[in-house]
Design a protein with these regions (language model features):
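Well-ordered beta-sheet/strand-loop patches within structured domains
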Residues: 4-24, 28-327
């Protein structure tokens, strides 16, 4: 029996993403066909019951599932590290637990991340322990609360998200400064058991590709630190980061300055920096300080190419009648 080559041929097809925005990968199809004339010649020349071999021509598509997968979560878009070296064990446990809840969380284009939804209620049943947290203003402003320390994780994630140029949906500052992050770049979160204001930290994936949150803690005898990274796909219009700088000129001299390898050596790298203006004030609540935080971008020549105010509709106010360094 003779077959036509088109009966056995398989057209090559490149791998592709699904069209539903979920970035499911449909694998490639390897093309194959054989030369019918060569097969016919070999068949006619063959003896009775002789086996003939017909070479198959194989075409590997240029875009494979592996190459598409390699484009996802390939580039470090934003990162932040904060320290909790002097925290008690309960607070350390809460930080580790919150970090584990947000770790490996994926956001597709248009998705909104809600810290409270992902981490969940800070309850004993969920594994949270009592640790110092802000609960008001004045002498009784710091008390042990279940989940104390959760705000360090939300604040670290908030900084990573604005380094990555993600869209902030909701963010509220603490009533007092915290010692693990620069003024104007913190983000408090609460889920009251009954009544009270729910405070969340939310941001949107405004990219054309999915992003992944990576969160981890490192603890030694000398230092305990929390790192949150946001991985995605660097697009042509994005600033390729080579340095993240969130340096505070404040009493505790907090410094975060991370240099990273350029994702694409043929593109210009940029330094992304937070700069905070501070204004003192006094009202019925006492002395305070307001901040306006800028996101600045510098090119490889050290020239400022972008200066924009974060949360431009309102400045961040902190009570300053005393200093507490919790949550």
């Amino acid at each position: 029996m003779l077959f036509r080559s088109q009966d056995l041929a398989v057209e090559p097809m490149e791998a592709r993403f699904s069209d539903d925005g979920r970035f499911t990968i449909y694998p490639e199809t390897v093309g194959c066909w054989f030369d019918t004339e060569a097969a016919k010649t070999a068949w006619l020349a063959a003896g009775v019951a002789e086996t003939i071999v017909v070479p198959i021509q194989v075409t590997i598509p240029a875009v494979t599932a592996a190459s598409l997968e390699a484009t996802l979560y390939h580039d470090l878009l934003g990162a932040m590290t904060t320290r909790y070296t002097n925290s008690g064990e309960n607070r350390c446990s809460n930080v580790r637990l919150c970090a584990s809840r947000i770790n490996e969380h994926i956001l597709y284009p248009g998705d909104v991340f809600s810290y409270n939804e992902v981490v969940g209620k800070r309850t004993e049943e969920a594994g949270f322990l009592p640790a110092p947290a802000y609960v008001g203003v004045g002498e009784d402003s710091v008390k042990d609360e279940l989940g104390g320390g959760a705000c360090q994780v939300s604040s670290t994630l908030y900084c990573a998200s604005i380094f990555a140029f993600l869209e902030t949906i909701e963010r509220t500052a603490h009533v007092y400064p915290v010692n693990y992050i620069q003024l104007g770049t913190d983000a408090t979160v609460t889920i009251p058991e009954e009544g009270g204001n729910v405070m969340d930290m939310k941001f949107r994936n405004n990219k054309n590709y999915p992003i992944k949150i990576v969160a981890y803690t490192e603890e030694t005898e000398e230092m305990k630190s929390l790192t949150v990274e946001i991985w995605g796909t660097l697009e042509e219009t994005d600033y390729m980061p080579v340095e993240f700088d969130n340096t505070a000129s404040y009493t505790w001299d907090l410094v975060y300055d991370r240099v990273i390898e350029p994702a694409y050596p043929n593109r210009e790298g940029y330094k992304i920096k937070f700069e905070t203006e501070r204004f003192s004030f006094e009202d019925a609540m006492g002395a305070g300080r307001r901040t306006i935080t800028h996101r600045e971008v510098y090119n490889s020549a050290g020239e400022k190419v972008l200066d924009e105010i974060l949360n431009p509709t309102i400045s961040t106010g902190y009570a300053m009648d005393t200093y507490y360094y919790h949550n």
